[in-house]
Amino acid sequence: ILYKAQEDSTDVYYFAGDARNNWVRFGGYYWRIIRTNSDGSVRLLYHGTSTTATDAYIKSDVKHKFCWSENSQGVCQNDDPMYVGYMYGISGSLENNRLNTNNSTIKIAIDTWYKDNMIPYTKYLSTTAIYCNDRSIVSGQYNLGNSTFTFGAQYRLQQNNVPSYDCGSDAKGSWFDTKQSSSDMFTTPNLNNVGNGKLTYPIALITADELVYAGGKMYANALNYIYYNSNNKSSTGVESIWTMTPISWFESAAVSFANTGSDNPGYLGIGSVNYSGSLRPVISIKKDLIYKSGDGSAENPYIIEAVPVNTYEVNLNVNSGSGTGTVLVEEGKDAKFTVAPNSGYKVELETNTCGGTLSGNSYTISNITSNKTCSISFKKNGTSLVTLIRANAVNENGYRYEGSD
């Protein structure tokens, strides 16, 4: 059975309960369909290499459990509200936290897994699907001390049991902030400027709201397809999985939602962000992909026509300007960046390590055939004699410049 809700005033359809017909085989892995997105793409939840997996979470060479953010010594942190961010900026205010200049540890882990396993399938994934890290404050005042404040999902899910697919929604048709915050709407860079464009790869985590739509309940066991594998066992064994959704700052500790394993089947609870949990990635396949075969069952999952394509990562560092970033480019195509000089610099290149071309604010590196790390710098504006005169410039003898030259 499919259910209907809305995202961005667009009808979307989702699976709930003990769904048995939402299995997909894509990119060499099994996935469960969560829902459609407002851009028409289809959101999938990772289920590993088998429909019977009891370890449907990603693993690195050394571990399979991750806290939200580690410091440079590898110590998990929860002593600042900014650590509920999938990305975060600097401390001191919500506005600062939402600058999204630093990757969380869980984002680094997910990005690493994607880079190692899914890069050739990037062309099939949506760049405009939104992955929500709702940091809207509902009650209390932002602080770094012992005073509690709560984020949007606490009001929606814990107080009212009214989930929403709209990031930052109060579930009443409006927003907790003055307007919807694009800083919490994670997307990859896209031509339509949807979301914040901060993701390097089109992958993230499930939200607590999506879990509730799927049949999850706050502080209660809930046996639904998120929990079950095709053998009606826990997809993650005893492991809990992190969602992308923060809940509160509580007595000097940052707290987020987690979904538990077989010890408390399907229980949607909370955990301090310095706890370690497992990660089940979420991706969104484009709406126009061609169905190849299957009926969605575990025995005969939907299979999408998706031939892996050589895809390369191009990193650009912009000195004396803005536009530093990373793009994924199919072999033989061009890498394009939007760049701009800082004040005092002009739209001309001083250095250009990869030989790209600059046209206005568009910088292009043609015919990508390998991974690249490139850098450019802009030329500094020269100081004219007129500017010196206007600034009352004098020479070493104390005389002002005079005349036309």
Q: Where do the language-model regions lie?
A:
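Long, domain-scale functional regions
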Residues: I1-V309, G382-D405
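Append "Rare intracellular matches occur via the same short Y/T/C beta-strand/loop motifs
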Residues: I283, A335-V339, N371-F378
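Conserved "repeat-terminator" motif of extracellular CCP/Sushi domains
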Residues: P308-L316, N361-S384, L388-R390
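Short, solvent-exposed loop/edge segments of extracellular or virion-exposed proteins
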Residues: T311-E330, R390-R400
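Short proline/glycine- and polar residue-rich coil/turn motifs
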Residues: V329-E331, N367-I368
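Surface-exposed interfaces of beta-sheet-rich extracellular modules
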Residues: K333-T364
